Structures are given as structure tokens and as C-alpha cells.
């Protein structure tokens, strides 16, 4: 019988490069510049995470164009060790959940337009990449109150988005988008992870969600802004440390901590103050 304590893997950590302009998912992610059809950066998060193993670094090339698609870290494969963490290096990149609204999705009565998003509950309407001003309406308010929406504003009411504008939304590209998928970054059952230098915005629910079983996870110089519900939600038994963190201009919460979740923050900018839920 062989009993060994404190044994860790000696496999060398690698860097996997992701480039949403020049990358290709048939490549191996081993170089920042494309070499040939098989050697060079990958294009998507899914491909990078499929290649990744413990203690690796995923390096996002900041191309100036937002990355689309969510980033999901799960389990042993996307974890590290106390002295050799698994890393996501954003290099100032943006992860965006904005989804263009097809012109055919809009209906109108006069200058009041509406569309029905497939996913309900939290909404965000964007024009030219920026949130439009929102007009608040209660669900039980009568339909006549839709007339109170000011020009250039939008409101959500009974599963629809209403937007008042003189533009013809069903003709030409008005560059309108909604916050699309649920969360930009999801963390579950991971340990010894560092995520740094990126912005997460325009997701339907949360910029970052840690629903459970996370420990020794550090977010450094991360911005979560303009998401539908919260900049970040920590739930279950997750413990997240934030350093130079900014959670601002989100739909309802800057930081939502539920259950036994723990947030350890240093030099954080949160607007409004954090929400602690049972």
C-alpha cells in the first residue's frame, strides 16, 4: 500500500490563445498569431475550454470587438492549485450578451413599437451598443398607461418590450439589440481560479454568476456593467474575492449574495450597495 500526501500534478501549464477575429476553432490555441490551418489561436470560448486542463491560462486577445458567447468554468478541469491557479486573462476585452433585434420582430401602433422577447423576466434594450432610458411600469398597470412612455424611452409590460420612437423600426437597420443569454460568466464547482482584466456587459440576468461550490476564486480588475438583473450573483456555498471590482449600472443589483455565499471585496465600486438575500 502506497500512501502519498500532498501530491499534485507536474504537467506543465499551457496558455490557450483566443482571438475572435483571426482565430479558428480547428486550431490548437498554442500561439497568439495564426501559423497554419491547425496551429494558431482559437475563435470561441467553447473551443478554448474544451482544450483547457488544470492550471492552464486562457488568454483573450483584445481585438477591439466584443466577444460573443458565454464563458462557463466547471469542475476539476477548470480549476488550479493554490500556487498555480487556472487563469482567464482578458487583457481589457469585453464579453457581451447583446443580441440584435430583427426588424421583423417589431409591431407598432403610431410611434409606439413593441416586440416579445423569447426569454421573459428581465430586459434591457440597447441602441448603438448603449442602454436606452427605461420607463418603469408595473405589471398590473392598465394598458392605457403605455401612453405615458416618453419618446426615446422603453418599458417592459406583460412579457413585451415597448419603445416609443418616430423611427420606422421595421424598415432598415436601427442598430437595436436586447440583452440576450442569461449570464456572461458562470462559475461552478471550481477552485483556485483567477479572472482578470475584462468587462462583462449586456446579459439578461447577471454579468457573473457563481451558483455554488466555488472557493479561492479571485476576480481582479473586472467590470460588470449594464446587465439585466445583477452585476454579479454569488449563491450556495461559493466564496468569491474581488479586487478592483466595478459593479455598476445593472438592472436591479450591483452584487446579489444568496444563501451561504461569501463575497470578500477589496477596493470595489458598487452601485447600488450589495443585496443580501436569504
Each model region followed by its residue ranges:
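Extracellular polysaccharide-degrading/modifying enzymes targeting complex plant/algal/animal polysaccharides
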Residues: 17-210, 233, 256, 274-277
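Boundary at the C-terminal end of the N-terminal hydrophobic targeting segment
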Residues: 11-13
